[in-house]
């Protein structure tokens, strides 16, 4: 299983679980911390970051990143590692982190995934909103440069009426 495969699984998982603005690893930005999320999404009053790990050594190296050693610098009010089975255990997790385990092409086990009513009230982290803002701003700036930003001024398309 490759990093790209796992990133796609993470993005689909977020989308299926109520997060509708998913940014994946291919979306690279310049921000104050240098963090490049494998998958991050935003819903009303909460953000969720998924960090993909394909190997144990990759997971162990992650803790040395500046925004992991200093959690207040990182993105995500909720943070999860996603990996194939038998790479990361619940006992390995840093405080506040959850774990999503993949078998085949789907998340098969979840540790720390909250129920819908908890996303805004029991956040384990106070995300670096400046870094998140920079991430979203970069997306909007790219849309503007491509000439697509005007489309947001027109609202949702009206549903077609069938005769």
Named regions from a protein language model:
Residues 31-36, 56:
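A short, well-structured beta->alpha microelement
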Residues 47, 53-102:
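Catalytic cores of nucleic-acid endonucleases
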Residues 1-16, 91-163:
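Non-catalytic C-terminal interaction segments of nucleic acid-processing enzymes
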Residues 34-49:
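Active-site beta-strand-loop-beta-strand hairpin of nuclease catalytic cores
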Residues 22, 40, 100:
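Residues in well-ordered beta-strands of folded domains
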Residues 15-32:
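A short acidic/basic microdomain associated with nuclease active sites
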Residues 3, 32, 60-62:
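A conditional alpha-helix N-cap/helix-loop micro-motif detector
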């Amino acid at each position: 299983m490759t990093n790209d495969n796992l990133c796609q699984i993470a993005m689909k998982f977020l989308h299926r679980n109520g997060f509708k603005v998913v940014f994946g690893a291919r979306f690279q930005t310049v921000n104050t911390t240098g963090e490049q999320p494998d998958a991050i999404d935003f819903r009303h009053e909460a953000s969720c970051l998924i960090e993909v790990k394909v190997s144990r050594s990759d997971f162990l190296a992650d803790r040395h990143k500046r925004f992991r050693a200093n959690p207040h610098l990182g993105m995500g009010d909720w943070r999860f590692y996603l990996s194939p089975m038998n790479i990361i255990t619940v006992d390995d997790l840093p405080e506040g982190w959850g774990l999503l385990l993949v078998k085949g092409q789907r998340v098969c086990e979840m540790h720390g995934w909250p129920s819908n009513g908890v996303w805004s009230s029991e956040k384990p982290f106070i995300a670096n909103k400046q870094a998140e803002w920079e991430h979203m701003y970069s997306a909007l700036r790219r849309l503007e440069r491509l000439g697509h930003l005007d489309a947001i001024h027109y609202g949702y398309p009206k549903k077609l009426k069938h005769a």
